[in-house]
Regions:
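SAM-dependent transferase fold signal centered on methyltransferase-like domains
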Residues: 1-169
Length: 169
């Protein structure tokens, strides 16, 4: 959603945290992060469940001449199973909206439910970068996630914008 869209500055910062040949973004959204990842990674896959948004982003990437980004519309877990390949990095920006609960802040309440899917994700990548809301309790996040290597607190003009969780198997 628009309110979760990364700014150019935060997307550029995220791109400095990854390296290698391949990255899959399981929660593609508007693709701002993927555009910057594509400057550092040879092949980026933008996976977005919303058909209309996926089409718009694919069109925008063509206009931006971002030839190393592929757009796949569909459920990210099914996409991982279908592709059945290892990635150097996986990026996840879970939706912090829940139909039943409204706006949520615990990782287990987000979509996808990263804590429940972590073992599944590790089958496809040993390095995972997760973006969360700055209001997420870091202690709670550490309890929900395993293998946390680094937590980045990203701020612009003295305002915390997001937390980035580097997780390695």
């Amino acid at each position: 959603s628009v309110e979760q869209t990364s700014s150019e500055q935060t997307a550029q910062y995220k791109s400095t945290l990854v390296s290698g040949d391949s990255l899959i973004d399981l929660t593609g959204g508007f693709g701002v992060d993927d555009y910057y990842f594509s400057k550092k990674i040879k092949s980026v896959i933008h996976c977005e469940i919303n058909t209309e948004l996926s089409d718009i982003v694919a069109h925008n990437f063509k206009l931006l001449d971002a030839k190393n980004i592929s757009c796949i519309q569909g459920d990210s877990s099914k996409t991982l199973e279908k592709l059945n390949q290892k990635f150097d990095w996986m990026y996840i920006d879970p939706s912090r909206r829940n139909d039943a609960k409204g706006k949520v802040f615990m990782l287990k309440d987000c979509l996808p439910n990263v804590p429940d899917l972590l073992d599944f994700y590790f089958k496809y990548s040993e390095n995972i970068l997760i973006k969360t809301a700055p209001i997420l309790d870091i202690s709670a996040g550490l309890l929900e996630l395993k293998c946390v290597k680094t937590i980045h607190i990203v701020a612009l003009e003295n305002e915390v914008k997001e937390l980035l969780w580097e997780i390695s198997k």
